[in-house]
Amino acid sequence: MLINSPYIVAMTGGIGSGKSTIAKIFSELKVPIIESDIISKKIMFSEKSILNSIKNKLGINFSLNNNKYSKLVLRECIFESKSSVLFINKILHPVVKKKIKKIISNVNFPYIIWVTSLLIEENLYKYVNRILVIDVDPEIQIKRSILRDNVSKNQILNIINFQISREKRLTFAHDIINNYDYSCIRRKVFELHKYYLFKSKKYFKYDM
């Protein structure tokens, strides 16, 4: 049994880069996955006080149901201005961080994959052992996002503009997966999995 905290690999990338797809491959290898976006949405739609603060700030009204329409309406309003983004981050991220810390403390595996879009923007990279960047051509990134979310190109560009640039993100990377060929991606994930298991040995003692 593991008796100390896991080696933390942060997976980051822009919208539509394919983070969730690659995280799924890691999960097939039994690696614990923590997805900040999923946790954020669950908290936002389950904590009435947080959601009401957001609705009042943005001047919008929508269902409390955690459905796709509500998420799209909310995201469109949030990314209309920098002040809205900063406001959401200020009230939501402390709660999300607390939840993530609790999840990590209960992990019984040598390492975890923490999927977060705002790793660099929020200075969260200081809390991880290694950074895995998922990189993709901007045109593919935009097309994927439009098809997945059924939104306009302008909406996707707004979100991209609020995120750190591709070039700067890559400067933080210890490891990079170029998300183009799925068969190559799987092979790369398997290679990284072995490497992360090796790296994590420095951080663990096993209670036999």
Swiss-Prot record:
Its lineage opens with: Bacteria, Pseudomonadati, Pseudomonadota, Gammaproteobacteria, Enterobacterales
Pfam families, per the entry = CoaE
**Which InterPro entries does the entry link to?**
Depp_CoAkinase, P-loop_NTPase
Q: What is this protein called?
A: Dephospho-CoA kinase
* Alphabetical keyword list: ATP-binding, Coenzyme A biosynthesis, Cytoplasm, Kinase, Nucleotide-binding, Transferase
State which pathway it belongs to.
Answer: Cofactor biosynthesis; coenzyme A biosynthesis; CoA from (R)-pantothenate: step 5/5
The EC number of this protein is 2.7.1.24
Query: What does it catalyze?
Result: 3'-dephospho-CoA + ATP = ADP + CoA + H(+)
Please give the organism.
Wigglesworthia glossinidia brevipalpis
Q: Where does ATP bind?
A: 16-21
UniProt xrefs under NCBIfam families = dephospho-CoA kinase
Quote the subcellular location field of this record.
Answer: Cytoplasm
Physiological role: Catalyzes the phosphorylation of the 3'-hydroxyl group of dephosphocoenzyme A to form coenzyme A.
Domain DPCK intervals: 8-208
Q: Which CDD domains match?
A: DPCK
Q: Identify the GO cellular component terms for this protein.
A: cytoplasm
What protein family is recorded?
Belongs to the CoaE family.
Molecular function via GO? ATP binding; dephospho-CoA kinase activity
UniProt-listed Gene3D superfamilies:
P-loop containing nucleotide triphosphate hydrolases
One Gene Ontology BP term is:
coenzyme A biosynthetic process
